[in-house]
Design a protein with these regions (language model features):
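Conserved catalytic cores of very large enzyme subunits
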Residues: 1-195, 227-233, 237, 241-784
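Extended non-globular scaffold/tether segments
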Residues: 195-206
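Extended, non-transmembrane alpha-helical coiled-coils
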Residues: 206, 210-213, 217
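Extended, structured, electrostatic nucleic-acid-contact surfaces
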Residues: 216, 220, 285
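Acidic, metal/cofactor-coordinating or nucleic-acid-engaging core segments within structured domains
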Residues: 224
Length: 784
């Protein structure tokens, strides 16, 4: 948008945020532990509510004098939170190594370690989500760990889009009043739920008023009159929204941020997402613009303050989880554009202001997404392309033509499907009515193929980890191999679903979420917590990892072993067992003589589709513990690196322990040799119902491509092709290999360099060496 600029306020706040060191924080853990101890006899949901209220009343709050949007999750910026309710055992094991571990490091205070072990750890032993699950089902989960990663074992679920519109219209006071009215008429079994909502909304109101009081105290000592008046306005916003629905754009943005801070305090989970925020805030923006109390430059500055706040919260995982979710992805996903409930193209000034904010700041959060469809305006599309060209890894793009009809197959109403949003990385959701459990588990199809080839033996350790349905030497035909592979998928899927059910049960028992539930459709109506199935929709998503390697491997076996007989079954199996040492010629054939996924070759593309379809169709026959459907996704976050470490050599020529293909729908890097359009055509052969939980296609372009208006136009047309081919998702890195190598060598000089990892953006210099190398190795395109 012409004439808009980044203010000095924003530059100063950004510099200050990025310069502060990260620490692990036990502040909330101490408050929660004490509150639990004082309320041992309460029902769990009341205990949880009182604990959140105590944290809202007692945790240290801080305000920078220049801030237009206030509210902090921790006393310091980008602190990692110790959350003992979900997991304390791993913290105890890893506290000392947090500053030195390979990925996602945090500084620690020695006195915090001592306090944790003296005060916090003893109380939570055997009571945390992590410990309870380990007692109930840990052995069974560990048995399948080389093939399946079960998630949410030591942290709350998250991955949900609350009803922001309801929150803005009611605020904590309105929801408190609603809970009080429900308490007068509810059934006995619903009382604890409504009482818990009442408690947390009282806490939310108090939290907001605390900021009002602090800022007013600060304003009294402020000598700059302009700044003083701004501070008073910010303070009044906090007080106003604690008492009534929001009335102005500034209040609406402030209220939105408080919602997400409190959600984080309640659950300490990733991927709470605002959804279609340009639409949520539109009425307040238009009103203020019309009345002359706001202009576009002022609105942009408020938005950029919100963007900075999104970057102040990071998520601290255990070292194992940090490999799978590297770079602190917290998943505040905001979607702009797309269709309205009637199928019309929709965008507004805020859509462009959000893009402008991303262009100015280039930060990893929020995870900005653009919904595209056949009727998307050229104006919005080309502006989004110009932001892509800036190289921050955003925005990513979603395809209404693929998404809307596919998620309706899950029982989602058309009006809700048209209003879909994204949570976390690429996970599809409806807004304000869906607990999607979109990160339930990851299923390593390549490891399942490995044990089908070896008779259940792990190539890396030699141990038996699966049933023996035969091995490659015993399969006289390719069909026999396929039959054994199906049996291995079935075996691990059954085990996985039993584990997922146990995880859901434990969340219901231990981590009810009354604050979140108040903003989810049907929960307040039915007096049921969202974790227990109170939402309108109750899905569970499983990720298939990774069809590119799988398709390439199966085609290699079929062609070289069974069709052309270039090698025997024993030779191929021995080559895998020996990591191709002594079998270099065979590996060269696997790599160079066999067609590869990503080049628009039906034979290999359809092999990937065939197995993804099998997995999806079988999975869809099951229901989760909340009686909702299971469905599939195809995205890896950064799991393609650690999951690759668990897989031996594969028939596509990949060496043992090397990363699998990134993304989820992306080709193996270096094998997509026919250009980006061929990649699109390959991916389009994957049925769109395979990715109702989200699909991910990564591409990397050189910055030079975007230097001219012709390049911008060509790229916009490329995205139109993406829409026509009904591919659900696409995202881009725009960066030179030389810059990435320089950043590895001199990280301090490239502190602000962000890259697209897999569905999210992270600072390149904060990624572990293995993941940096994988990103550098991805195919780069200079033209379309």
């Amino acid at each position: 948008m012409e004439g808009l600029y980044q203010t000095q306020r924003i530059k100063d706040l950004k510099d200050k945020m990025l310069s502060e060191p990260r620490y692990a924080s036990i502040e909330q853990a101490l408050i929660i532990t004490k509150t639990y101890q004082e309320n041992e006899d309460d029902p769990k949901i009341i205990q949880r509510a009182k604990s959140l209220k105590a944290a809202l009343e007692k945790m240290e709050i801080r305000v920078e004098p220049e801030e237009l949007i206030v509210g902090n999750r921790t006393a310091g910026v980008r602190y990692g939170v110790v959350f003992p309710e979900s997991g304390s055992t791993w913290v105890d094991k890893e506290f000392e190594t947090l500053p030195t571990r390979a990925q996602d490091r945090f500084n620690v205070h020695q006195e915090d370690i001592e306090t944790f072990r003296k005060v916090i750890k003893p109380y939570w032993e055997g009571k945390s989500l992590e410990d309870v699950l380990n007692q109930r089902y840990g052995k069974e989960i560990n048995k399948i760990a080389k093939v399946v990663k079960i998630n949410q074992k030591d942290h709350a679920q998250g991955h949900i889009c609350p009803d922001c519109v309801k929150w803005l219209k009611m605020g904590p006071q309105g929801l408190l009043a609603q809970a009080e009215e429900k308490l007068k008429i509810c059934k006995e079994e619903q009382k604890d739920f409504y009482e818990s909502v009442k408690i947390v909304m009282e806490g939310a109101k108090h939290f907001m008023v605390r900021y009002h009081d602090l800022i007013m105290d600060m304003a009294e000592n402020e000598s700059d009159e302009t700044r003083k008046q701004t501070m008073i306005k910010v303070a009044k916003n906090c007080k106003n929204i604690s008492e009534r629905p929001v009335q102005t754009f500034h209040e609406a943005v402030q209220s939105t941020w408080f919602l997400f801070v409190i959600l984080q305090m309640e659950s300490n989970a990733s991927s709470f997402s605002p959804g279609r925020l340009d639409r949520h805030l539109e009425a307040y923006y238009e009103k203020d613009i019309k009345e002359g109390t706001l202009d576009k430059q002022q609105a942009l500055e408020i938005i950029e303050c919100l963007w900075l706040k999104f970057n102040e919260i990071v998520y601290m995982r255990n070292s194992h989880g940090a490999k799978y979710f590297a770079g602190f992805p917290i998943g505040f996903n905001i979607a702009i554009g797309g269709q309205d409930e009637n199928g019309n193209d929709t965008y507004n000034d805020l859509s462009f202001l959000f893009l402008e904010a991303q262009k100015h700041l280039g930060l990893p959060q929020p995870n900005l997404s653009v919904r595209l469809h056949e009727g998307t305006s050229d104006k919005l599309l080309k502006e989004a392309v110009r932001v892509v060209a800036k190289g921050s890894g955003m925005p990513q793009f979603f395809n209404d033509k693929a998404v809307i009809p596919s998620i309706q197959e899950l029982g989602i109403e058309e009006k809700d499907a048209r209003d879909y949003a994204i949570v976390g990385c690429v996970e599809l959701t409806t807004q304000g009515n869906n607990l999607g459990w979109s990160d339930s588990a990851m299923f390593n199809l390549n490891k399942a193929l490995e044990v089908a080839l070896t008779g259940g033996i792990c190539l890396l350790t030699g141990e038996k980890i699966a049933p023996d349905y035969g091995n490659l030497e015993t399969y006289e035909t390719f069909k026999e191999l396929e039959a054994a592979f199906k049996k291995q998928i079935d075996y691990f899927m059954d085990k996985m679903l039993l584990a997922c059910e146990e995880v859901e049960k434990a969340h219901i028992d231990l981590l009810p979420s009354p604050f979140l539930s108040a903003s989810i459709e049907n929960c307040m109506e039915n007096g049921m917590d969202v974790t227990a199935g109170g939402a309108k929709y109750n899905l569970s998503g499983i990720q298939m990892i990774q069809v590119a390697n799988l398709a390439d491997s199966l085609v290699a076996i079929k062609q070289l072993v069974y069709d052309e007989k270039k090698c025997t079954q024993k030779e191929m199996l021995d080559a895998l067992k020996n990591n191709f040492e002594g079998y270099e010629i065979l590996r060269a054939m696997c790599v160079n003589k066999v067609p590869k996924y990503g080049n628009d070759i039906d034979e290999v593309d359809k092999q990937g589709t065939k197995w993804a379809d099998y997995f999806k169709n079988r999975l869809r026959t099951f229901k989760n513990y909340r009686k909702g459907p299971y469905h599939t996704g195809m995205y890896t976050v950064s799991a393609h690196v650690p999951m690759g470490e668990n897989v031996g050599a594969t028939p596509d020529g990949r060496y043992a322990k090397e990363p699998l293909a990134d993304g989820g729908m992306s080709p193996v890097y270096g094998r997509d040799i026919k250009g980006p359009t061929a990649v699109l055509k390959s991916v389009s052969k994957l049925d769109k119902t395979l990715t109702t939980n989200g699909g991910l296609l990564n591409m990397k372009f050189l910055p030079e491509f975007f230097k001219t208006e012709t390049g911008i136009d060509k790229f916009a047309n490329f995205l139109r092709t993406f829409v026509d081919l009904e591919i659900p998702h696409i995202q881009f890195n725009v960066v030179r290999k030389e810059d990435l190598l320089a950043a590895k060598k001199n990280p301090e000089q490239y502190r602000g360099l962000t890259v697209r990892v897999a569905g999210y953006t992270a600072y390149f210099t904060e990624l572990a060496d293995e993941l940096q190398n994988e990103i550098i190795a991805r195919t780069s395109y200079g033209d379309i």
